Amino acid sequence: VIDSGQNVVSNLISANVPPGPMRSLLADGAVAGVGGVLIFLPQIALLFFFIAVLEDCGYMARAAFVMDRLMTKLGLSGKSFVPLMSSFACAIPGVMATRVIENRRDRMVTILVAPLMSCSARLPVYILMTTAFVPPDLYLGGWVSLPEIVLFSMYLVGIVVAVPVAWLLRKTFFKGETPPFVMELPSYKWPSFRIVMARVYDRSKAFVVRAGTLIFATTILVWAAGYFPADHTELHQLQSQIENTEVTIAQLEIQNNQDEVDAANVERGKLVERMNQVSGDLIEASFLGKMGHAIEPAVRPLGWDWKIGVGVIASFPAREVIIATMGTIYSLGGDVGEDDPSLAKQLSAATHPDGTPIFNIAVACSIMVFFALCAQCAATLMVIRRETNSWRWPIFTFVYMTTLAYVGALITYQVGMLLLT
């Protein structure tokens, strides 16, 4: 619903604001920024609804008690179980759910490892890479395919890495004996609807007010980096021509003039193709493109080129943005999805200047491992800032997760290339 509403508002802006920086700022910057905040709201509200129900009926305390022995061995608390499980859907409500953990050390460790759980935003990256580059070999008598094994492995990566990270955090930054797990087990009772909804409202409002402004600002900054300083004159002219052609097509359809409709559709297709090509060129000429070229020497050992680097930088507001960015760079437009065969085809056909393919299974796995471990989610970092009341911990989270992601992607690519040769 929020996605549809975002598209409706963007279309209204496109219909009423002429092509230019203002339209792009409103449609691609402001609307995307507001959508980037609201898109998390249903997940957060739903999570807090269930947490409030479990708390009010008395089950949450028992779940924490049951899981405490296992979680303590990992350097966490039994109360860390629900926040970490929630992080598989989205790390934002997972981080916010750590409020139920009274012990500061346990809460901080849980906050810092929660983003390692593979959230739903990583799934489009996994789907695109496995669909395009992982062969559909079957195992166990045809019950399991190689893409399914790879996809499942990406979820395991975060869990496996989170265990030593949590242990190291407890041995370094958050030293101290784990206090005995003592708590009063309340009696079971039916939850109060009024109390549950009041908690959901208060916590959801806190997210929108506190983290929303920072998420919005980050989205605007990334938009500006992808828009300036390139000259968009030709792009704006093409957008105007496409809109005029669409009006002409609508008029011809009313007149039932099919031959001219077909001719106009062909002309529109050529204009769209040219617009997508220009959009890709403008990305390269933007500050974002220049950053991609600047980091290319650093990402080349991962098997990446500057285009993949741009996609990674552009995905900082949200990981799934890399799909639209790659679609724009490869002249397919920003509306392509992870299951679009044209994007997979373009990536498969992409080559380096010497003619060697850019993408293969080693590069695809390198990208997936990077996204499984990286902190490419501004919203999560902003929530960590709000929950810890310090910039130190989101910066620390970004640095340690990016380092882990880089090392993991490097090992994956280098080992993969050895196996391929």
Describe the function of each predicted region.
Residues 143, 166, 170-180, 188-251, ...:
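Long hydrophobic segments that form regular secondary structure
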Residues 4, 8, 12, 61-89, ...:
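Juxtamembrane inter-helical linkers in multi-pass membrane proteins
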Residues 47-52, 130-133, 154-168, 217-227, ...:
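Hydrophobic core segments of alpha-helical transmembrane domains in multi-pass membrane transport
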Residues 1-30, 34, 74, 95-110, ...:
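Extended, low-charge hydrophobic alpha-helical regions
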